[in-house]
Amino acid sequence: MGNHLQISVSLVLCIFIQSSACGQGVGTEPFGRNLGATEERKPLQKPEIRFLLFKDESDRLGCQLRPQHPETLQECGFNSSHPLVMIIHGWSVDGLLETWIWKIVGALKSRQSQPVNVGLVDWISLAYQHYAIAVRNTRVVGQEVAALLLWLEESMKFSRSKVHLIGYSLGAHVSGFAGSSMGGKRKIGRITGLDPAGPMFEGTSPNERLSPDDANFVDAIHTFTREHMGLSVGIKQPIAHYDFYPNGGSFQPGCHFLELYKHIAEHGLNAITQTINCAHERSVHLFIDSLQHSNLQNTGFQCSNMDSFSQGLCLNCKKGRCNSLGYDIRRIGHVKSKTLFLITRAQSPFKVYHYQFKIQFINQMEKPMEPTFTMTLLGTKEEIKKIPITLGEGITSNKTYSLLITLNKDIGELIMLKFKWENSAVWANVWNTVQTIMLWDTEPHYAGLIVKTIWVKAGETQQRMTFCPDNVDDLQLHPTQEKVFVKCDLKSKD
């Protein structure tokens, strides 16, 4: 099944990019050549780009801004005292604007406390091409966006620092080219890349893609970087000041390639686009979620890789090591590029709460143990029962294990936890045959497992807590047994 899945995924990617790398020549430069090889060639058609401005959250048509026609600024309700947020869509497989555009427009316009001008760069006629041709057109579209911003600067004294470009997929690189085409020492304020496109951009130099040099502040959300045949829909490499990789960035919860065949049977080849868009477009919905649920901001934490993050080793917010994903990110100037990871839910609101648990075991048996545990957490707001605990390796003598646990609810301050060794027929038999008598003072005790101390760190609040067994006279943990742990005054383990 795994091999068939790999093949189907590779075929999906080939169809997605429609490039000569998969044996589909498009009459342009071969796939894999960087943009520098084609940038001198003109696009296959005259640029057809519209700049639309939206008056309110229900506006679906927009009003067209025309550079060098100042009357359109008044007609479209442009307010020079408010920032300008421009949305830039990506490659198109059907020649239609995607429905998420109206969602993000509505979310931006509905924030009355932070009024902004909301616009759209409609380059659909240049995006509805073979992928390699659309890639070539991104530089031209970026230059046209820069021309619009320069005109606003000259005619309205509108500072480029008040501009925020939000680009999805190929649109992210359009944003980068717009920023780099502005000229002068001053840069536009912010660029947000929503799963910036990978094919023909991965591994290229900064001037051939979105990079931190293109704006005062650049952030990117990577949601579909899973590679097959050396290709990934979204770019994998960091390209911003803050690069967020939700759930590791390779794929997203709720998006299943295993359902591809079922979707094709039900919806035809359109199912291929739907399956890919689930993970690729998740970046957009995470950004919209940050606008619609400003009280439930997703927090990303700087980490070297997803494996370390999954062990809970990176929940540190010192020196800008954590930040909010999405619209309300803290914009820190002149920051060294940071790679951040986080876990999300499969649907909006996407926020989860991250906790690091460090559990100190003492194994009194001779061989490593791999039992199954669950933990119940009691907070000041909520209680969550029977969270499965996966250690990833056998328990050896006197060792501390670190793991990441995420909660869908805010439980408040953690005040007590219950740690249970879940029973199984195998472990019951093992326990009955290998237990031995140990003398401890004058009372007999059975050799087994002791959970000595549990250290907890809450990622979102940065609070550290230490928990010790409630009954210090009975430390042994046996199958089916549950131990209560309460806060104690031991020094938190770093």
Swiss-Prot record:
Principal cellular location given in the protein's record: secreted
Keywords carried by this UniProt record: Glycoprotein, HDL, Heparin-binding, Hydrolase, Lipid degradation, Lipid metabolism, Secreted, Signal
GO terms under biological process: aflatoxin metabolic process; cellular response to cAMP; cellular response to hormone stimulus; cholesterol homeostasis; cholesterol metabolic process; cholesterol transport; chylomicron remnant clearance; chylomicron remodeling
Catalytic reaction list: a triacylglycerol + H2O = a diacylglycerol + a fatty acid + H(+); a 1-acyl-sn-glycero-3-phosphocholine + H2O = sn-glycerol 3-phosphocholine + a fatty acid + H(+); a 1,2-diacyl-sn-glycero-3-phosphocholine + H2O = a 2-acyl-sn-glycero-3-phosphocholine + a fatty acid + H(+); 1,2-di-(9Z-octadecenoyl)-sn-glycerol + H2O = 2-(9Z-octadecenoyl)-glycerol + (9Z)-octadecenoate + H(+)
Catalytic residues as annotated in Swiss-Prot or TrEMBL: 169, 195, 280
GO molecular function, one term: triacylglycerol lipase activity
Region annotated Essential for determining substrate specificity, chain positions: 255-278
This protein's record includes keyword Cytoplasm: no
Documented activity regulation: Phospholipase A1 and lysophospholipase activities are inhibited by annexin II.
EC number: 3.1.1.3, 3.1.1.5, 3.1.1.32
Location of the protein in the cell: Secreted
PROSITE patterns listed in its UniProt record: LIPASE_SER, PLAT
Signal sequence annotation: 1-21
Domain PLAT: 353-487
Top EC class, one word: hydrolase
Disulfides per UniProt: none
Function according to Swiss-Prot or TrEMBL: Catalyzes the hydrolysis of triglycerides and phospholipids present in circulating plasma lipoproteins, including chylomicrons, intermediate density lipoproteins (IDL), low density lipoproteins (LDL) of large size and high density lipoproteins (HDL), releasing free fatty acids (FFA) and smaller lipoprotein particles. Also exhibits lysophospholipase activity. Can hydrolyze both neutral lipid and phospholipid substrates but shows a greater binding affinity for neutral lipid substrates than phospholipid substrates.
Listed name of the protein: Hepatic triacylglycerol lipase
